[in-house]
């Protein structure tokens, strides 16, 4: 947008040869002169201008998430941003003495500025009255009056003229100073703090007046600077607020954009699915936004969805996330810079030497451990943004998820190193396997928790699989049972990523075994263990069979026994399930040659 604005600026300068006026530095006195004595006129020349300047203001809804009037925070941020950019004094003078730009009085007029005759005459009258009053006071007090009575009359007339003219000037200065120290933001915040006034219609009228004043000021600056102005408000963090407050912000945006000549552009940086859910769940939007996507289509004039992140872009983001970890070698550097603590002066020389040697050995050992940990962490993080490795393909196109993975890797590697120190005879996972396990737990927490829960249940039952068995095989053996629990685990299943990528991850690229999973599970910190507990409870409840009703001798003849009914139902169910299983396997063989699990 800035490049487009610069290009249009250069083209406009070549066309009209008029330089834009400055509004800062030495241009402020000229701007104040125009504000007080000249009236802007919207001419055809101004409407044909193509050069534009963008003013960017960022609004984080998270900062105002705790207030009831989130949309009021939007308006105050807008007012404060414009006031900060152009200065408090010009806006204060315009609030008191400024005039709204008007259209041309006749179609042939090309002048953009007209003299404000009323203001000039009023100012001349005040100055003349002030000079007259000062002169009369000078005559009455200087002894130039012929008589004592005339001297009193001159003194009274001079005092009245001086008081009236001076009070008029002082009132104007006082109003400018009041607007200079009391900004629009403070006004709106003061109105919001009044609970009774906030629920009345007058509150919205006052806010609308402030917004109209802001719009007129921007229109004045457009004519003065000889360029078009557009205020771009970037709204972020809206998906972290309550639905009612999200609706309030959208209503405020629609109110600000209701004027067709409003110089505002709003950019909503938000997930549309979350925004649509907020609109549908808001109580005050029933009947208006029953379908949140239709409401957004009526509100948003330019939808722009960020495309899928490319390979180079993802690697660059991962590289930046890794570089932001400035604490990888911090511990090693601080150990080298720590001053040596003085020994105990009262102890013997041998005791001091022994303590120094012991402390030196401990520091050297800890230094080697920290250096090895830093090396492993660096190796693991390099696997994330290595173009020759396939691990980056499983990282989501989300900066927040990237940082979550990068922040988890050092902790996992540290815990693995400590575990290997306790068991030096065992060969632990490599740093690449550690970061792959972190990605697995971050991308598919439900499926990974299901595999781990199945392993735990089989181990408790005494039929644990071998350590060389693959996790993918365990998942295939229990995928049908997981399919029957989709309704109970719907919210948890929504956390998982692409199922096909999960199959390729565990089946081909990273075939973790049961032994590796049990070793890595002790060092896993980014997996919610409550998911496994919930799955264990559901499996335990589904394993319970209802007791069969008691057998009645009187019903043996005319009716079949419940056992026979249950057996018949079981046989029919088995035939149906076997038929569906055969059909499913036949359908899968046409695609891959072996049956695929249902997950």
From Swiss-Prot:
Segments of skewed composition (Basic and acidic residues): 579-591
Any Pfam family the entry gives: KAP_NTPase
Entries under InterPro entries matching the protein: KAP_P-loop, NTPase_KAP_P-loop
Domain KAP NTPase: start-end pairs: 1-416
Membrane topology: Multi-pass membrane protein
Superkingdom per UniProt: Eukaryota
Region listing for Disordered, in residue ranges: 543-599
GO CC list: membrane
Cellular location(s): Membrane
Keywords: Membrane, Transmembrane, Transmembrane helix
Lineage: Eukaryota, Metazoa, Chordata, Craniata, Vertebrata
Chain ranges passing through the membrane: 25-45, 119-139, 156-176
Protein name from the UniProt record: NTPase KAP family P-loop domain-containing protein 1
């Amino acid at each position: 947008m800035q490049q487009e604005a610069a290009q249009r600026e250069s083209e406009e300068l070549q066309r009209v040869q008029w330089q834009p006026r400055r509004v800062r530095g030495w241009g402020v006195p000229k701007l104040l002169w125009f504000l007080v004595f000249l009236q802007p006129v919207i001419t055809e020349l101004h409407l044909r201008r193509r050069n534009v300047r963008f003013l960017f203001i960022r609004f984080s809804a998270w900062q105002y998430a705790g207030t009831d009037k989130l949309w009021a925070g939007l308006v105050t941020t807008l007012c404060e941003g414009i006031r900060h950019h152009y200065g408090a004094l010009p806006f204060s003078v315009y609030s008191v003495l400024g005039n709204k730009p008007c259209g041309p009085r006749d179609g042939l007029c090309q002048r953009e500025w007209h003299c404000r005759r009323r203001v000039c005459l009023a100012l001349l009258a005040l100055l003349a009255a002030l000079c007259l009053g000062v002169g009369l006071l000078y005559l009455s007090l200087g002894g130039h009056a012929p008589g004592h009575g005339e001297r009193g009359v001159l003194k009274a007339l001079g005092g009245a003229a001086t008081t009236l003219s001076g009070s008029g000037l002082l009132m104007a200065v006082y109003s400018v100073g009041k607007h200079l120290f009391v900004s629009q933001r403070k006004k709106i915040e003061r109105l919001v703090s009044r609970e009774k006034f906030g629920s009345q219609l007058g509150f919205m009228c006052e806010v609308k007046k402030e917004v109209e004043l802001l719009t007129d000021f921007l229109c004045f600056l457009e004519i003065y600077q000889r360029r078009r102005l557009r205020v771009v408000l970037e709204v972020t963090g809206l998906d972290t607020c309550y639905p009612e407050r999200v609706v309030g912000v959208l209503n405020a945006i629609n109110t600000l954009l209701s004027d067709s000549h409003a110089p505002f552009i709003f950019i909503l940086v938000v997930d549309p699915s979350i925004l649509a859910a907020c609109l549908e769940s808001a109580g005050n939007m029933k009947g208006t936004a029953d379908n949140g996507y239709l409401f957004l289509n009526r509100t948003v004039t330019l939808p722009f969805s960020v495309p899928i992140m490319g390979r180079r872009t993802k690697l660059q983001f991962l590289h930046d996330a890794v570089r932001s970890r400035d604490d990888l070698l911090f511990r090693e550097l601080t150990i080298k810079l720590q001053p040596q603590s003085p020994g105990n002066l009262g102890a013997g020389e041998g005791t001091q030497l022994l303590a120094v040697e012991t402390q030196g050995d401990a520091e050297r050992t800890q230094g080697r451990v920290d250096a090895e940990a830093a090396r492993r962490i660096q190796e693991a993080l390099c696997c994330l943004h290595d173009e020759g490795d396939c691990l980056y393909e499983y990282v989501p196109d989300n900066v927040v998820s990237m940082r979550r993975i990068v922040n988890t890797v050092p902790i996992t590697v540290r815990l693995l190193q400590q575990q290997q120190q306790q068991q030096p005879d065992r060969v632990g996972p490599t740093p690449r396997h550690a970061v792959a396990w972190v990605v697995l737990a971050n991308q598919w927490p439900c499926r990974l928790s299901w595999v781990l829960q199945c392993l735990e249940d089989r181990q408790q039952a005494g039929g644990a699989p071998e350590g060389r068995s693959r996790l993918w095989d365990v998942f295939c053996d229990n995928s049908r049972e997981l399919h029957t629990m989709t309704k109970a685990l719907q919210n948890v299943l929504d956390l998982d990523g692409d199922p096909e990528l999960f199959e390729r991850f565990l089946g081909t690229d990273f075939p973790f075994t049961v032994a590796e999973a049990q070793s890595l599970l002790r060092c896993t910190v980014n997996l919610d263990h409550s998911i496994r507990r919930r799955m264990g409870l559901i499996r335990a409840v589904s394993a319970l069979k209802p007791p069969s009703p008691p057998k009645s001798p009187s019903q043996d003849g005319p009716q079949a026994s419940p056992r026979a009914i249950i057996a018949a139902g079981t046989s029919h169910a088995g035939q149906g399930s076997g038929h569906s299983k055969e059909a499913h396997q036949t359908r899968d063989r046409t695609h891959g040659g072996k049956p695929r699990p249902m997950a």
